[in-house]
Amino acid sequence: MSPEVIRNLGWDLMSGSANAAVLGILVLGVRWLLRRHLSPDWRLILSGLVLVRLVWPWEIPSPVSLFNVTAPLLPPINSGSFPVDGWRWCLAAWAAGVVVRFAWVIADWRQLQQRIVRSRPAQSGLAALWNEAIQGESEFLRRVPILQSSEVSGPCLAGLIQPCLLVPPDLSEQFSKREIRLIFLHEMAHLRRRDLWLNVLLEAVRTVHWFNPVVGWVLRRWREDREEACDVHALSADRGVSKVLYGQVLLKCLESAAGLKADRVGVAWQGDPSSAPPSLVHRIQAIARFRSGRRTWVVGACTLTAVALLGLTDQEPLPPRRVWLLKKESILGLLPPLPGFPTV
């Protein structure tokens, strides 16, 4: 590649990731401050602004841009501020990290596919409960098979083209029919939201920006908010369910999943065991605060608009420096008279 291409590629990657990191810090702060007032769906949309910023192709100068505040704090650098050899080494290190993380994700995917191959159809009773949970839903959901696998400790969705629901063989012994119905309602919400495909998007972003910790934090919070959104769907779909019962089912699933590694390509009902207990505490608190029909769209829409105006716009260009041109007579008039010399 030519030196100009190397410079531009390295600069676009670094500056785009840095801008997304600044916006990500803002989103994480807003998310923490307004957690009780924003629904999980609105928090997901806010986190999505960080992904939008990563691929944002336009420069929109604005006086309210967040980068008007951050730009003066940083040194004035551009693609030409570093030698070409430095950009080459940086891009080589970045590409090596992408390859390693991509191989890691592929290994997880192959392991999950092997679990699907080694699984067997579930009992007819579980299939009947699934059909009851998805009653009135689309044909796509009715075609999702339920498979039993001794290699999973809790319900887990897997597969992109032909998704399936993996459950442990003793699911009927661990949970009552009412509890299994709640689990199925939660998993149905993941299918309706196309979360398996969103997993691919999140992992692709994480792979490209593996060096950016802020992007990693935002995506981790995205997964937590996604689980809370599916909790809300399950509680809303079964109006007679007790919030205490739902929380107990969640705790039982997490207890059985303790010590297990989370899959990057599957969606488990208990969420990511590696992020517990903070994630568990947030989910339990959200379940306790759940109220059917609660509307948060006013707060969500206003917050989204404000964060978008701050984070999707760019720094205004600095005003040009004024150069004062003075006439010769004006300059001489400013000088004090010197003794022994005639004045003009």
Question: What kind of feature is each model-predicted range?
Answer:
Residues M1-P336:
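Hydrophobic topogenic segments
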